[in-house]
Design a protein with these regions (language model features):
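HAD-like aspartate-dependent phosphatase fold
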Residues: 3-142
Length: 142
């Protein structure tokens, strides 16, 4: 269920070309797999991956975001040896997505440092609409 990636906007700063940006309003969703779109299965038990229990509302919400034009990329701690069984599972259930990045570090407590805008949403059991909310965040001191 792969689709052509969107046209990125070429960007320059101080007369030099820099990494391109997404069009306004478009999001790059990086979505975990185990415990987020299906039951949590550790890499040590790959025989369970083909029959992982789906979280139906995840399928509904992610496909809605895909249909709205956002980029859907799965970012998982599963390894390359799990890619085929994972892609087969995603396709069997009808997930629409653009790509999958394997080998996310395990253990949680992620802290992403980037020169681009980053938002993080912790999955706590339900895929609902995303809403704006203020929170305390850690930033680099000026």
């Amino acid at each position: 269920a792969h689709m052509k990636k969107p046209t990125l906007i070429e960007t320059t700063e101080n007369g030099k070309r820099v990494s391109p940006k997404l069009p306004p309003g478009m999001k790059n969703f990086l979505i975990d797999i185990d415990g987020t779109i299906c039951e949590d299965i550790p890499n040590e038990e790959p025989e369970r991956m083909a029959d992982a229990a789906l979280f139906p509302e995840a399928l509904e919400k992610l496909n809605k975001w895909y249909d709205e034009g956002h980029i859907i990329t799965f970012f998982t701690s599963r390894t390359e040896e799990h890619r085929m069984v994972t892609e087969e599972w995603l396709n069997k259930h009808g997930f629409k997505y653009h790509g999958m990045v394997m080998g996310k570090p395990r253990g949680g407590n992620y802290h992403w440092i980037d020169d681009r805008e980053v938002r993080a949403t912790r999955y706590e059991g339900h895929f609902t609409d995303l809403v704006e909310r203020s929170a305390t965040v850690q930033v680099f001191e000026d």
